[in-house]
Amino acid sequence: MDLTKFLGQDSQEQSAQRLSKEEYAAQKKQEREEIWGMIDGKAQEVFQNGDSLKGFLDFMGQCKPQRTDNLFLLYAQNPEIRQVKTFEKWKEEGKVVKTGSKGYNFIVGQEYEKDGVIQQGYSIQKAYDISQIRTKQPEEAEPKPMDQLMEALLTDSEVRIQIADNLPDKVQAQYIPNKRTIYVRNGMSENATFHSISRELACASLDHHDGSYSRAGVSAQAYCAAYV
């Protein structure tokens, strides 16, 4: 029985207090090495081929926003995870973890002071998916009409989006950095239009306006961002 679902981190901290300082440090060091080994292993697996990358991007789309290392860590433990929070965070929301639920390893950022300076660190804690919580489970969102999606995509765009009839063959849309404009072919299917504009908006967001922009350099990130 995992008592952390009833007692949170308190029992773990009390257990740690029974270890010597050296034993506790060694235990935590081993824990961190195992966690980062899991993250590195999953990252290498994800980028092996297109299918494995697609699976990870699908996971990113279903999972509530997380830092990248947590995404790899959670994906390695259960690709069905949708929304995770620590025991304490669920408790703050008045939610209860289901009996028998096993927590997932989870990286939690935290601040600490060293030599009078605030530093950024992290700890390894247990987190629980919403499927493990006694609450009404979220329903899958109904697909929105394409017109509504397109309007949301184009609203408040930081770059101009303009129809162009002279794009090269097989080019659906293209971001031109020195003009801060996305040129898009008219008359494509709804899906092709939406995804091509999404991709070029992602390219534009990766342009730092310092002359370093390279289409080849941002393509992979842009395609992934647009897919998600």
Task: Describe each model-derived feature in a short phrase.
Residues M1-V228:
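N-terminal accessory/interface modules of nucleic-acid-binding and processing proteins
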